[in-house]
Amino acid sequence: MKFYTISSKYIEYLKEFDDKVPNSEDPTYQNPKAFIGIVLEIQGHKYLAPLTSPKKWHNNVKESSLSCFKLHENGVPENQLGLINLKFMIPIIEAEVSLLDLGNMPNTPYKRMLYKQLQFIRANSDKIASKSDTLRNLVLQGKMQGTCNFSLLEEKYRDFGKEAEDTEEGE
């Protein structure tokens, strides 16, 4: 597994249909916020599941929660590294995602945290895939709420950019 970012235009497009899609940009953010996540293949759709940095409330999240996957340093569970927010995963078009090149990032605590997150994610990729598949199924069956609307987003995401193409063809 690797880390990816996604285009702001694509995020804006999905937000037209589902306001649970996380923001990638907002004028209230003190620093630009990259939408970084991992790509999961779930029943014929590729999804980007976003990461979030560690926050105090993560301590209250149970490991069994399907809405997210807690991250910590391998072998050091006390060193919390954030979450994968599975409840906010979005179906993607590959042309709108870019590989995050960790090698070209300056050596900062943030980069070191990303490497530790990636190591933990790779070691737990089967658990992450299983949890995300279960979550999607429960949401599609109407048995879980507070997530992105996976069925609506799956219906709409492939139409991204088609309006512009249709306009160009009609000229």
From Swiss-Prot:
Species this protein is from: Pectobacterium atrosepticum (Erwinia carotovora subsp. atroseptica)
Pfam families, alphabetized: ToxN_toxin
Gene3D superfamilies, alphabetized: 3.10.129.130
Outcome of gene disruption: Loss of resistance to phage phiM1 and phiA2.
Domain of life: Bacteria
GO biological process, one term: plasmid maintenance
UniProt key word Hydrolase: yes
Top enzyme class: hydrolase
Induction: Part of the toxIN operon. The operon is repressed by ToxI and ToxN together, but not by ToxI alone (ToxN alone cannot be tested as it is toxic). About 90% of transcripts terminate after toxI, approximately 10% include toxN. Constitutively expressed in P.atrosepticum strain 1043 in the presence and absence of phage phiTE infection (at protein level).
Effect caused by changing residue 115 to A: Still confers phiM1 or phiS61 resistance, toxic in E.coli
GO terms, molecular function: identical protein binding; RNA binding; RNA endonuclease activity
Functional note: Toxic component of a type III toxin-antitoxin (TA) system. An endoribonuclease which is active independently of the ribosome, cleaving between the second and third A of AAA(U/G) sequences, although not all occurrences of this tetranucleotide are cleaved. Digests many mRNA species, including its own transcript and its cognate antitoxin RNA ToxI. ToxI has 5.5 nearly identical 36 nucleotide-long repeats (a single repeat neutralizes the toxin in vivo); a single repeat folds into a pseudoknot which binds the toxin.
Outcome of substituting residue 142 to A: Still confers phiA2 resistance, toxic in E.coli
Alphabetized InterPro entries for the sequence: ToxN/AbiQ_toxin (IPR025911), Type_III_TA_endoRNase (IPR053735)
Name the UniProt record assigns to this protein: Endoribonuclease ToxN
UniProt effect for mutating residue 116 to A: No longer confers phiA2 resistance, not toxic in E.coli
Outcome when changing residue 117 to E: No longer confers phiM1 or phiS61 resistance, not toxic in E.coli
Family to which the UniProt record says this protein belongs: Belongs to the ToxN/AbiQ toxin family.
Reported impact of residue 37 to A: No longer confers phiA2 resistance, not toxic in E.coli
